[in-house]
Design a protein with these regions (language model features):
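Aromatic-glycine-rich donor-binding/catalytic loop that engages nucleotide-sugar donors
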Residues: 137-154, 163-173
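Short aromatic/hydrophobic "clamp" motif used to bind/position activated sugar donors
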Residues: 94
Length: 259
């Protein structure tokens, strides 16, 4: 039975007030005193990390139990930050959330845990969006981590859906939770990013066009037309499975488990 889970949030300086509101929602509505909250603070592209903002993040963490901040001094891809949350958490199951999320359902955490324990699903979206999804360390290593060649943000979710369909024959399942949704605050974004639509970086779109080609016999994922992957993926964190298999041997050594 799964009863331990980590919540991970990616944020940046323009979203500070949203982050504060979200933490208050998590604390008051869900009650996460026994749940680790990993906050990954991203730098803005080609900007210095403001020290006053960094200090405020540390103050937020200091004022609450079980909050673990990871602060990036420069901009990193959303794919890398999602991977980082999953790798750095101490639980197999992880809830990944955006910082512009509204949570008005006090039973959200129980609903998620009940769904996990009744279905055994290791990778699923909530309300059909990657603004909020659940993933395990195990499935991410098996399927392959989010592709960090998408060096900005956007397209990494559609890429993962495509790879899930390729490997398992279907896209990941979805869990519906009422009063739980992304507010889509695209107005609060970094300025030094060339975009193509909805403030999504052009670079990731162009890389997606290299990685996939239109194909009438291809896969329908998040793309409006069927596509086929033409650029190979590779295991970005090859030794994570080795660590997961052997970490109990650090305190009381039995044997090295090779994978």
């Amino acid at each position: 039975m799964v009863d331990n889970i980590t919540i991970g949030i990616v944020t940046f300086k323009e979203r500070l007030e949203l982050l504060k509101q979200m933490i208050n929602q998590l604390m008051s509505l869900i009650g996460i005193d026994n749940v680790d909250l990993i906050i990954v603070v991203n730098g803005n592209n080609e900007e210095e990390m403001p020290n006053d903002y960094r200090r405020e993040i540390l103050t937020i963490a200091n004022n609450h139990d079980n909050i673990y901040p990871i602060i990036c001094p420069e901009f990193k891809s959303l794919a890398k930050l999602w991977n980082t949350i999953t790798i750095f958490s101490k639980t197999d199951y992880n809830i990944i959330l955006t910082d512009d999320l509204f949570i008005g359902n006090e039973f959200s955490l129980n609903i998620i845990l009940d769904y996990i324990n009744s279905t055994g699903s290791q990778f699923f979206t909530i309300n059909n969006q990657f603004s909020h999804f659940v993933v395990t360390k195990s499935i991410l290593h098996e399927l392959g981590y989010f592709d960090e060649r998408f060096i900005a943000f956007g397209e990494e979710d559609g890429d993962m859906v495509h790879r899930h369909i390729e490997k398992f024959g279907e896209r990941m399942p979805d869990l519906h939770i009422t009063n739980f949704y992304n507010m889509a605050r695209y107005d609060l974004s970094s300025s030094k990013v060339e975009t193509h639509t909805d403030n999504k970086p052009r670079f990731n779109r162009e890389f997606a066009n290299i990685k996939y080609k239109q194909d009438p016999n291809g896969v329908y994922g998040m793309s409006p037309t069927p596509i086929t992957r033409v650029l190979d993926d590779y295991q970005q964190y090859p030794y994570e499975e080795f660590f997961m298999k052997n970490k109990d041997n650090i305190k009381n050594f039995k044997k090295v488990i090779m994978v």
